[in-house]
């Protein structure tokens, strides 16, 4: 049995593909006996008892859509506290270079860290934050992409080896 922190930069109380993947994966890992905590922004009551809310999100324009992010200092402090309060064996970051809880967790490097990349197509964020993102990505123990196009985007800007593990 592993103690796993699953960290999302997106509010898990707002519907979205990454949020659904985070909650679904957490449920499945718990079903097979792992202890999983989801650390994420949450607008309102947590959707599951295993979610540690990190504060409210701010609608943020990104890559042609609006993402519910929490890139503020209070969310960072809650992330630090949550990760320090529990001794996790693995930290799994979804969208590890998106500003907010995932970057905070990556900088702490308290356990082996898996980064799952979901974004595909092209990304202004990857282009603009290239040097910082590349530096942050170097701190990942394992890099995962959810599709070939997500792998192409991440490897274009961040280099490294990626394993494709499809959603679901």
Model-derived features with residue positions:
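Carbohydrate-associated surface elements
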Residues: 42, 149, 168
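N-terminal strand-loop element at the rim of the active site
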Residues: 2, 8-15, 22-73, 81-82
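Short, flexible loop segments at the rims of nucleotide/cofactor-binding pockets, characterized by
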Residues: 14, 66-71, 92-93, 119-125
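Active-site proximal beta-strand in glycosyltransferases
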Residues: 4, 90-92, 97, 103-123, ...
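Membrane-proximal helix-turn-helix segments that form the acceptor-binding/catalytic region
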Residues: 121-145, 150-152, 157
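An amphipathic, basic-hydrophobic alpha-helix
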Residues: 61-90, 100, 128-135
């Amino acid at each position: 049995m592993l103690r796993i922190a699953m960290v999302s930069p997106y509010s898990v109380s707002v519907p979205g593909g990454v949020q659904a993947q985070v909650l679904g994966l957490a449920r499945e890992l718990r079903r097979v006996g792992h202890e999983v905590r989801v650390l994420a922004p949450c607008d309102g009551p947590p959707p599951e008892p295993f979610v540690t809310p990190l504060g409210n999100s701010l609608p943020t324009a990104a890559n042609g859509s609006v993402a519910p992010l929490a890139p503020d200092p209070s969310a960072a402090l809650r992330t630090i506290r949550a990760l320090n309060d529990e001794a996790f064996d693995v930290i799994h970051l979804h969208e590890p270079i998106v500003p907010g809880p995932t970057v905070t967790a990556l900088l702490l490097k308290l356990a082996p860290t898996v980064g799952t990349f979901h974004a595909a197509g092209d990304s202004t964020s990857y282009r603009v934050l290239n040097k910082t993102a590349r530096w942050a990505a170097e701190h990942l123990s394992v890099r995962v992409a959810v599709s070939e196009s997500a792998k192409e985007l991440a490897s274009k800007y961040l280099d490294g080896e990626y394993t494709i593990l499809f959603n679901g």
